[in-house]
Amino acid sequence: MFTAHARVALMAALAAVVTLPAHAADTMAKIRETRTIVLGVREAARPFSFVNAQKQSVGYSVDLCLNAVDEIKRELKLSDIKVQYKLVTGPERIPKLLAGEIDLECGSTTNTMARQEKVDFSYTFFVAAMRVLTPKDVQIEAVKDLNGLPIALSKGTTSEKLFTQLAGGELQAQLTTYANNGEAYKALREGKVRAFPQDDSLLLGLAAGDKALDALNVSSLALSVEPYAVMVRKGDTALLAVVDRSLARIYASGEINALYDKWFKTDALTIKMGRLTRDSFTRPNKQAGVAMLLGYSI
């Protein structure tokens, strides 16, 4: 069912495609010439972007990007586009995008004011909240509850940035940065740390994949709002317009609901659609994330 806001977003995305400056169409021209697109994907950002047991890159974000590829095919009037997948980590995703190694980043990347200086973002496709994963015997209801705890951080993430800013002020804790979410989660499970702050959806995905939901707590305390979006190169207006159009179409038609249920309502994991996520479908937007309790952007 088409909402008024989704209809307007779709019309805007359609209009953007026909008002593009020539210099902004480089990636679309490359795709037309090579008939290939490279998607930047994650190894273990379940359920958004991960490698399954069959060694395939799958997930909610991956499906959204594949939907965008179909839209690109229609725009370029191509019968087929070869899709290549390239694994990226948190610290690598922006450098690899800017270097041209990937064309779209299809993971769990938060749209932030700082990142907007380097890249462009699509419409929001999910809104997470930063929370804290702990063993069952640790309860986190305020930042002060983290004082004195050894804490794991994942490199190149908004949680690393936020907790680094908090350290030495409101937060007095031992921070250890790990290469990725999987390593930080492993440190928690092995007892090397007692807390792991990260987006709640990713924490639940890690715990569900490990069949450890009953042994862990995800804090009621939410430290930030984390709107996820597809990343493209800064100024790549032609490609961004088509990605936005593909998202606006499935939001307006309601197809997004079935896609959401496919990845967030499974035997292993159930994540109810939050109000902010639903609002992003009915009122497509590109609002940046914010550390809501601390009063600054992330």
Over which residues does each language-model region extend?
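Bilobed "Venus flytrap"/periplasmic-binding protein-like clamshell domains
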Residues: 44-47, 57-74, 110, 128-181, ...
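Immediate post-signal peptide segment of exported/extracytoplasmic ligand-binding proteins
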Residues: 24-54, 139-140, 144-149, 282-298
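Extended ligand-binding regions for polar small-molecule ligands
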Residues: 63-71, 144, 149-150, 155-157, ...
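Periplasmic-binding protein-like
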Residues: 43, 126-134, 200, 208-247, ...
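Acidic, polar ligand-binding/catalytic clefts
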Residues: 66, 78-145, 281-296
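A ligand-binding cleft/hinge motif common to bilobed small-molecule-binding domains
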Residues: 92, 106-117, 162-167, 187-190, ...
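N-terminal signal peptide c-region/cleavage motif recognized by signal peptidases
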Residues: 19-21
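Extracytoplasmic small-molecule ligand-binding "clamshell" domains
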Residues: 29-105
